[in-house]
């Protein structure tokens, strides 16, 4: 008689907006990780939705959780709680719950009470984001931002004390957490660099023409227009640079958001600055990344950033805000700035002396296969070894 196949242990990835991803962030991380781990685990991924239910996407079980969108982080905390309760009811034999953002630490308490193995990813120093955003918020909303920042600080503490393991996505964040909270089990696991589909030169020129751009005649930033991502710094700096080149900023624009209103006001009548809104078509994103004069990454908080890793594949000059987690990735192969005036000087240098940089060797430890193997070991160490498949990813 043939032996029955050993069922794969069930794991849940909780806290992203869901799969398939658009670009960057937790969604890309969850998608790339789940499609590699599904050979060894029965993977559940929670998805923000307008309904409840479970379906499949590329062999991964999507758990749809009704969620209300909001500019603060209070609702995601509730979303994680609902997702945890739903999974405990619908996937009763799930072995491990992995919360991909620090606010999941509150929900990890529930999973621990239900005797599940738990992991929480602290992401960046998330509570600092709210303090930066608060400066641009309406006065009557600032107490809410302050309260949310405090909730995230508590979440950071819980993320280091409640789960069976805590994940830091950069060595600088790991050092910070170890010094401040002394987690019982602290692991380093970064993100991977997504490879976009190749686009032939004729198609690239066509895409650029539609966007009103020319090859190597624009600076580029791809990211959410939120205060901690520092886009106001680059607009302020670029306006002081005498150049016919353009500044292209790609990211979803909420025209009611006070920070977006600030960016539009700061841009003024400068026609060189183009706020293109969200662009998710891979061929267009590839074309923009491949043909920029330089890429500006003004993010001030966070850990390893997937959008930055993605840009490094193109070997265009990168100008980054000077923080340890950017230096950790880019090393000496980048321009660094702390103020708008420093950025002005860097852009003037690039204008007169453009150069390319080879970042590929930096990316060896940032491939998704490498990252998935790291996570396999972490998950495997927490789940009953007799129930895990020992084969290699």
What kind of feature is each model-predicted range?
Residues 313, 317-320:
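Short hydrophobic beta-strand element within catalytic cores of glycosyltransferases
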Residues 173-194:
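Helix-loop-beta element that forms the nucleotide-linked donor phosphate-binding surface
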Residues 54, 203-206, 246-272, 276, ...:
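Short, structured helix-loop element that forms part of the nucleotide-activated donor/catalytic region
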Residues 75-89, 94-128, 303:
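An aromatic- and histidine-rich active-site surface loop
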Residues 300:
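Aromatic "clamp/platform" in nucleotide-sugar-dependent glycosyltransferases that forms part
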Residues 145-166:
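Membrane-proximal helix-turn-helix segments that form the acceptor-binding/catalytic region
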Residues 12-14, 208-229, 235-242, 248:
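Conserved donor-binding/catalytic core segment of Leloir-type glycosyltransferases
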Residues 2, 6-9, 16-22, 36-71, ...:
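N-terminal strand-loop element at the rim of the active site
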């Amino acid at each position: 008689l043939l032996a029955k196949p050993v069922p794969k242990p069930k794991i849940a990835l909780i806290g992203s907006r869901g799969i398939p991803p658009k670009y960057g962030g937790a969604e890309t991380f969850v998608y790339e990780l789940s499609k590699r781990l599904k050979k060894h685990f029965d993977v559940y991924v929670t998805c923000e939705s307008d309904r409840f239910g479970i379906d499949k996407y590329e062999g991964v079980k999507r758990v749809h959780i009704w969620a209300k969108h909001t500019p603060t982080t209070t609702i995601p905390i509730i979303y994680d709680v609902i997702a945890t309760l739903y999974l405990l009811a619908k996937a009763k034999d799930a072995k491990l719950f992995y919360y991909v953002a620090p606010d999941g630490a509150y929900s990890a308490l529930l999973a621990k009470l239900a005797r599940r193995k738990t992991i929480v990813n602290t992401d960046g120093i998330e509570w600092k984001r709210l303090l930066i955003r608060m400066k641009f918020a309406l006065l009557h909303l600032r107490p809410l931002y302050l309260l949310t920042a405090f909730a995230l600080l508590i979440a950071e503490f819980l993320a280091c004390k409640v789960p069976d393991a805590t994940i830091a996505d950069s060595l600088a964040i790991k050092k910070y957490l170890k010094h401040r909270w002394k987690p019982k089990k602290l692991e380093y696991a970064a993100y991977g660099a997504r490879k976009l589909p190749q686009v032939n030169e004729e198609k690239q020129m066509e895409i650029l023409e539609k966007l009103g751009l020319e090859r190597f005649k624009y600076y580029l930033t791809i990211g959410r227009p939120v205060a901690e991502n520092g886009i106001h710094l680059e607009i302020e700096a670029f306006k002081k640079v005498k150049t016919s080149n353009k500044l292209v900023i790609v990211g979803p624009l909420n025209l009611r958001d006070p920070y977006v209103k600030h960016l539009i006001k700061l841009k003024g009548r400068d026609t060189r600055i183009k706020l293109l809104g969200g662009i998710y078509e891979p061929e267009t994103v590839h074309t923009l990344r491949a043909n920029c004069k330089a890429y500006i990454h003004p993010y001030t908080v966070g850990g390893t950033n997937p959008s930055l890793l993605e840009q490094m594949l193109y070997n265009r000059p990168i100008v980054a805000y000077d923080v340890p987690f950017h230096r950790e990735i880019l090393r000496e192969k980048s321009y660094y700035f702390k103020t708008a005036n420093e950025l002005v000087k860097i852009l003037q240098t690039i204008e007169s002396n453009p150069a390319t940089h080879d970042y590929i060797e930096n990316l060896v430890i940032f491939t998704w296969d490498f990252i998935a193997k790291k996570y396999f070991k972490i998950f495997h160490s927490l789940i009953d070894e007799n129930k895990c498949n020992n084969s290699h990813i």
